[in-house]
């Protein structure tokens, strides 16, 4: 299976840079020259500065309108660079990594996603977006809500990562984001690494594409890992990967249409009866009842790793909170703006023009 990672904006390019570290094909797109230069693993010839004629390489300061215009203006250059990377080999999935709350990512990702869908109709376009932390304030929340709406009409799936779930209580924001970015890549890379790999029961690219072709709905990744010698219940470990503690988004899993579970570990730990017990529970719980599974016994491993992907989700507390908060603020803002305009109009109404106060002055001077 071939996947290309395209990072957009500061958050997205940092995530893409980590994917590049673990040998994925990756591109970085940003309006900030400094952020692009900061990257460590994506080669310089795969870093694309956009919007230089608009913001001069200084970023868009979390303004998605500028981010959108930067991507639109330089889209031909971006698509040419992507075409050069794609070459003559098919791409199964384009993963677009970005931050929902930023400017370049929130504004530019929908523009690029639409262009990719048109240019590569046989490839999936999947958004991997980090939801803003509550501490970041209202502006990122509004950016996130509007971007969710736009992307849901374009991409095949939105894998939303709720940073509020992953942040530890004693971390500051910068520490949290760095650790979360690595966690996102580790989980998704673990899943992709098992696609088309020989195993007891394997997952192939068509399975993953089927699960992610979900009409712009949400998807979430679950994860659980433990030392094989310390596992008392394998079924419990697997179940943990698709319960709230293991998921990267607060969702109602019963609303999911599709599921995919990959289990990797030492052969003696992968007990069939416990695996099927857990998978049967997941099948019963999700609405779509369709579960793809892969079992990968590996005598070199000492840990059991479980990666779960649920898609076709339309019920998420994480998403609902963002959208409701954004709507409330937008209504209050628009009301305040309207009231302000009305007060200004009332205050200034009745003022004369200069010519009414100084009649004939211009004629006298001439």
UniProtKB/Swiss-Prot annotation:
InterPro entries, A to Z: CetZ (IPR032907), CetZ_C (IPR048737), FtsZ/CetZ (IPR045061), Tubulin/FtsZ_GTPase_sf (IPR036525), Tubulin_CS (IPR017975), Tubulin_FtsZ_GTPase (IPR003008)
GO biological processes: cell division; microtubule-based process; regulation of cell shape
Any single GO CC term annotated in Swiss-Prot or TrEMBL for this entry: microtubule
SMART domains assigned to the protein according to its UniProt record, in alphabetical order: Tubulin
Ligand binding (GTP): 10-14, 103-105, 136, 163, 181
GO MF, any single term: GTPase activity
Keywords carried by this UniProt record: Cell shape, Cytoplasm, GTP-binding, Nucleotide-binding
Purpose: Involved in cell shape control.
Protein family membership: Belongs to the CetZ family.
Protein name (database record): Tubulin-like protein CetZ
């Amino acid at each position: 299976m071939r996947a290309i990672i395209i990072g957009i904006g500061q958050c997205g390019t940092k995530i893409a840079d980590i994917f590049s570290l673990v040998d994925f094909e990756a591109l970085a797109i940003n309006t900030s020259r400094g952020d692009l230069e900061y990257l460590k693993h994506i080669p310089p010839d795969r870093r694309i500065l956009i919007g230089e004629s608009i913001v001069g390489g200084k970023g868009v300061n979390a303004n998605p309108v500028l981010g959108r215009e930067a991507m639109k203006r330089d889209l031909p250059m971006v698509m040419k660079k992507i075409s050069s990377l794609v070459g003559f080999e098919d791409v199964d999935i384009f993963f677009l990594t970005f931050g929902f709350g930023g400017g370049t990512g929130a504004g530019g990702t929908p523009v690029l996603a639409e262009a990719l869908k048109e240019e590569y109709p046989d490839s999936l376009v999947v958004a991997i977006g980090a939801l803003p932390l509550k501490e970041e304030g209202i502006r990122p929340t509004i950016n996130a809500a509007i971007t969710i709406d736009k992307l849901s009409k374009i991409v095949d799936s939105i894998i939303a990562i709720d940073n509020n779930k992953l942040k530890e209580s004693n971390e500051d924001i910068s520490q949290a984001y760095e650790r979360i970015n690595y966690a996102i890549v580790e989980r998704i890379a673990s899943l992709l690494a098992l696609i088309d790999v020989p195993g007891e029961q394997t997952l192939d690219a068509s399975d993953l594409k089927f699960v992610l072709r979900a009409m712009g709905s949400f998807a979430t990744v679950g994860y659980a890992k433990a030392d094989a010698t310390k596992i008392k219940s394998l079924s419990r470990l697997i179940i943990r990967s698709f319960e709230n503690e293991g998921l990267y988004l607060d969702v109602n899993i019963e609303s999911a249409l599709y599921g995919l579970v990959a289990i990797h570990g030492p052969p003696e730990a992968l007990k069939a009866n416990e695996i099927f017990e857990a998978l049967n529970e997941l099948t019963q719980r999700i609405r779509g009842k369709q579960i793809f599974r892969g079992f990968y016994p590996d005598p070199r491993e000492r840990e059991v790793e479980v990666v779960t992907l649920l898609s076709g989700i339309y019920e998420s507390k994480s998403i609902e909170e963002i959208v409701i908060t954004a709507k409330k603020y937008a209504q209050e803002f628009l009301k305040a703006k309207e009231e302000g305009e009305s007060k200004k109009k009332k205050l200034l109404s009745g003022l004369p023009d200069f010519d009414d106060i100084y009649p004939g002055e211009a004629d006298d001077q001439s």
